[in-house]
UniProtKB/Swiss-Prot annotation:
Protein name according to UniProt: Protein S100-A6
Gene that specifies this protein: S100A6
Gene3D superfamilies cross-referenced by the UniProt entry: EF-hand
UniProt-listed SMART domains: EFh, S_100
Residue(s) carrying N6-succinyllysine: K47
Assembly: Homodimer; head to tail assembly of 2 subunits. Interacts with CACYBP in a calcium-dependent manner. Interacts with ANXA2 and ANXA11 (via N-terminus). Interacts with SUGT1. Interacts with TP53; has higher affinity for TP53 that is phosphorylated on its N-terminal domain, and lower affinity for TP53 that is phosphorylated on its C-terminal domain. Interacts with tropomyosin. Interacts with FKBP4. Interacts with PPP5C (via TPR repeats); the interaction is calcium-dependent and modulates PPP5C activity. Interacts with TPPP; this interaction inhibits TPPP dimerization.
Superkingdom assignment: Eukaryota
GO molecular function, one term: calcium-dependent protein binding
Source species: Oryctolagus cuniculus
Swiss-Prot/TrEMBL keywords: Acetylation, Calcium, Cell membrane, Cytoplasm, Membrane, Metal-binding, Nucleus, Phosphoprotein, Repeat
Length: 90
């Protein structure tokens, strides 16, 4: 039986692949796919304006290929986890 951490990692991977490849490369997120993922999977997503999502995409897209690959996605989740951790500390 998978541990809770194994399950969490599987969920993060599954969510990436749920949205990647709806258009174009199935191993990356386009701007449209990233926007949909953020809006549907993150509580803060519905509060973000389009311009904020575009800025986030630009920040995440380290290699500037106009798509977010899995490594860039995981980097985003790591940064988000750090923000959540700080918020929980007080």
């Amino acid at each position: 039986m998978a541990s809770p951490l194994d399950q969490a990692i599987g969920l993060l991977i599954g969510i990436f692949h749920k949205y990647s490849g709806k258009e174009g490369d199935k191993h990356t997120l386009s701007k449209k796919e990233l926007k949909e993922l953020i809006q549907k999977e993150l509580t803060i997503g519905s509060k973000l304006q389009d311009a904020e999502i575009v800025k986030l995409m630009d920040d995440l897209d380290r290699n500037k290929d106009q798509e977010v690959n899995f490594q860039e996605y995981i980097t985003f989740l790591g940064a988000l986890a750090m923000i959540y951790n700080e918020a929980l500390k007080g």
